A protein has these predicted regions:
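Conserved catalytic-core segment of nucleotide-activated headgroup transferases in glycan assembly
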Residues: 31-37, 256-342
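Donor nucleotide-activated moiety binding/catalytic core segment of transferases
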Residues: 170-171, 317-371, 376
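Short acidic-hydrophobic, aromatic-tinged amphipathic segments that line or gate anion-handling sites
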Residues: 67-71, 336-338, 342-344, 409-421
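A short, charged/proline- and glycine-enriched loop
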Residues: 10-17, 173-174, 270-277
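C-terminal alpha-helical cap of glycosyltransferases
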Residues: 448-468
Length: 468
């Protein structure tokens, strides 16, 4: 597909906003929520810029131009400085340390803890082959870890003298603000921050996830402002990234505005309905299907087949598991996803919300979805179990991931470190007469704050004195 040309805009006193979408997952936050249109309606001139793979997925908007940037590769300077930052800051985040290790290690244990001797030897050889392959693929990490090599690399980058800039189409548009939804500093984000500063364009990096500041990457050059999920993210930005706290705005996440707009009163449950337990899967390799079956088998034996429904909602993008286990209990109701090509994630529609709101207890590893369950006052249990197959089980990750520790440190949230312990906590919550729970997670995300859209628009208006 050819790049489409940027239309000539008539002279206007409206502030110009350029929104750069570099990932299809941002479609949920910026288009499906109506956020792009709301900014335009608030008195701004908005143009969306997207690379080819995202552009073809975007809906048409009658009054907002969408520009195809084609395919843009990041500069070598951006690639290396972002990676070097991960190494230099690794002492400030346990996730950074883990991420560096996992560039070489497989998700499964190299020497399996069960199976026949010959099977374990074959699995070990396969894992060692993967370690060697990972070492070749990530050989530059060795350079980043050795101080003299880092000095040579910095010298090389200075001699290379690569220009870091914004795409020409954005430069020609001459925006007052460049807003970049982001899941990390990788890709063209860092180049665009540098280029925008040179062009005296104010920048906002809108962080679109929970774990970016503690686990994704470092920003070698910081934007003028970040927007983040909550107050705890402000603290991470200050401690890990040396940000000025006043430049980190805890507006929330655009796709989470739904949790600020719905009523949070506890719904009175119809006692005639079956009780429902929902297990939410995790992307990392974890023997969760065995756990789901164990939960289903226990409650079927304890209460009979017709008293409690067990639902399993797998992660839409799960890593490959090494246990080879599949659900055997035919009573388990498994969520089937429709086409995920547009955003790689399920739509946050009524069906999605009902899955959470109709559950009596929600169980899962400490993920964003479990935070969402707590935002709608569902009773929750965190799965912190380990298994014999994977080094990435939720129980082990609770000690490795900085952002996960923010959740597991909250003592009021029930946890299960073993399958029996998990079942015990679930059963206790089912027998509890209350129909909801109020966990102290306002520091992670506060549902009482104004919606992200309102806060962002107010912020832009306050800093745009030449509005019509």
């Amino acid at each position: 597909m050819q790049k489409n040309k940027l239309n000539e805009h008539t002279l206007t006193t409206k502030p110009r906003i350029a929104i750069l979408l570099g990932n299809r997952q941002f479609i949920r936050s910026w288009f499906d929520t109506g956020l792009v249109q709301k900014i335009e309606n608030a008195g701004f001139l908005v143009t969306v810029f997207a690379q080819q793979d995202v552009f073809v997925l975007l809906p048409k908007l009658s009054n907002i131009q969408i520009v195809n940037l084609g395919t843009i590769e990041p500069t070598k300077k951006s690639v290396h400085t972002v990676a070097l930052g991960l190494v230099s800051k690794r002492s400030l985040s346990t996730t950074f340390k883990w991420k560096l290790k996992m560039q070489f290690l497989p998700p499964q244990w190299i020497f399996p803890q069960n199976g026949s001797f010959s099977l374990r030897v074959r699995a070990a050889l396969k894992s060692l082959k993967r370690v060697l392959g990972n070492a070749l693929d990530n050989k530059m990490t060795f350079v980043y870890l050795v101080k003299p090599c880092r000095s040579i690399l910095h010298l090389y980058l200075r001699l290379l003298n690569e220009a870091q800039d914004i795409p020409l189409e954005i430069k020609q548009y001459s925006p007052d603000w460049l807003i970049m939804p982001s899941s990390s500093a990788q890709g063209i984000v860092t180049d665009c921050i540098v280029g925008a500063k040179s062009a005296r364009i104010q920048t906002i990096v809108a962080i679109d996830n929970w774990d970016q500041l503690t686990g994704k990457s470092i920003y070698p050059t910081k934007p003028d402002y970040f927007t983040v999920m909550g107050q705890r993210c402000v603290e991470h930005a200050t401690y890990i990234h040396d940000c000025d706290p006043s430049s980190v705005l805890p507006f929330g996440l655009p796709r989470f505005d739904i949790y600020r707009n719905i009523q949070h009163s506890c719904i009175v449950r119809n006692p005639a309905n079956k009780k429902k337990v929902l297990y939410c899967g995790v992307t990392m390799a974890h023997s969760e299907k065995f756990i789901v079956d164990s939960i289903a088998d226990f409650f079927k034996e304890k209460y009979g087949p017709d008293e409690i429904e067990i639902h399993y909602r797998p992660h839409p993008g799960p890593s490959q598991r090494s246990d080879g286990y599949e659900i055997k209990n035919n009573d388990v109701r498994i969520t089937k996803y429709s086409n995920l090509e547009r955003t790689a994630m399920p739509d946050m529609n009524k069906e999605f919300l009902d899955a959470l709101l109709t559950a009596d207890v929600i169980v899962g590893a400490p993920t964003t979805l479990m935070v969402e369950a707590m935002l709608v006052n569902r009773k929750c249990v965190l799965d912190l179990t380990i298994d014999k197959f994977h080094r990435t089980t939720s129980g082990l990750m609770a000690n490795k991931f900085t952002h996960v520790q923010d959740l597991t440190a909250i003592q009021q949230i029930p946890q299960g470190a073993t399958i029996n312990g998990l079942i015990f906590e679930i059963n206790k919550l089912l027998e509890d007469g209350s129909n909801c729970a109020h966990y102290p997670i306002d520091h992670l995300y506060n549902t009482r704050d104004r919606p992200y859209a309102d806060q962002l628009i107010s912020f832009l208006q306050a800093r745009s004195s030449y509005l019509e």
